[in-house]
Design a protein with these regions (language model features):
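Short glycine/acidic-enriched loop and turn motifs that connect beta-strands
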Residues: 49-53, 96-99, 178-182
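Beta-strand-rich domains and repeat architectures in extracellular enzymes and scaffolds
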Residues: 24-56
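Recurrent small/Gly-Pro-centered beta-turn motifs in extracellular repeat architectures
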Residues: 47, 93-94, 174-175
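Acidic, small-residue rich beta-repeat scaffolds with periodic aromatic anchors
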Residues: 5-7, 12-36, 102, 106, ...
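Surface loop/turn motifs at the tips and blade-to-blade linkers of beta-strand repeat domains
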Residues: 26, 70-75
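Short coil/turn segments at the loop-to-beta-strand junctions that recur within blades
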Residues: 73-79, 120-125
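Residue-level detector of Asp-centered blade-edge/turn motifs that repeat once per structural unit
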Residues: 85-86
Length: 223
């Protein structure tokens, strides 16, 4: 079963048109978090606003003459950025709270790097899990510490898993989350523990390769 995610192939409508020219007042660059692409052509700059009650971060990409805001929604923490080997995509690994993280995806366009999806890629992966039979086996849906993260092996096209997939085609995403389950000791229970799926950068679809089926069945705590 696969799930087509709208807006994951082309850039979301209006993303480029609404681009600001520079960080707003109050945002200052935190140079220790600056990241460069492997070829040095793209620089990701992270700007912090300390004037708000909760510190806010913005992420900007410099490439040639383009200086683009990667996401209009500010973040609460700095982030890590990973480039695909062909440099056409960037994955942002974003902490969103204690023990909680998600993923965002950006695509290279003539206007620079822009959002590939309206929702975070991590949220889309959770949406996909909810369409699967494994979700219906859960004793309880995750209540906190819900995280989406990349499976190791991204930079070598996951050949360590014994697969021979096309280069720069897939992202493997793992999901984890906890819930308080009455009768369990302790109540805090990892109800999703590294459930994995694959995202196709070319088609914008999720699927579960057969080699993950067995482990995925064990990654959810059943009733």
């Amino acid at each position: 079963m696969s799930l087509l995610i709208a807006c994951s192939i082309g850039v979301c409508n209006g993303a480029a048109a609404s681009q600001p020219a520079a960080p707003p007042a109050g945002y200052k660059i935190e140079e220790k978090y600056t990241r460069k692409s492997p070829d040095g052509a793209t620089t990701i700059e992270q700007y912090l606003n300390k004037d708000t009650d909760d510190w806010k971060w913005q992420f900007w990409a410099r490439r040639q003459d383009a200086f683009t805001l990667l996401d209009p929604e500010p973040a609460g923490y700095p982030a890590d950025f990973i480039f695909t080997n062909d440099l056409k995509w960037i994955v942002r690994v974003q902490k969103i709270g204690s023990g909680t993280s998600t993923l965002h995806l950006y695509r290279l366009t003539p206007q620079g790097y822009l959002r590939a999806n309206r929702k975070p890629l991590g949220d889309l992966a959770w949406d996909y899990l909810k369409t699967r039979r494994d979700w219906r086996k859960l004793v309880k849906a995750p209540e906190y510490h819900d995280s989406a993260y990349l499976v190791d092996g991204f930079d070598e096209n996951y050949r360590g898993l014994g697969v021979d997939w096309p280069a720069n085609r897939y992202l493997l995403i793992a999901l984890s989350g906890d819930a308080d389950v009455r009768g369990r000791k302790p109540m805090q229970t990892g109800v999703v523990n590294g459930w994995r799926c694959r995202y196709d950068l070319q088609t914008g679809k999720f699927d579960v390769p057969a080699l993950f089926s067995g482990d995925n069945a064990k990654a959810v705590v059943p009733e």
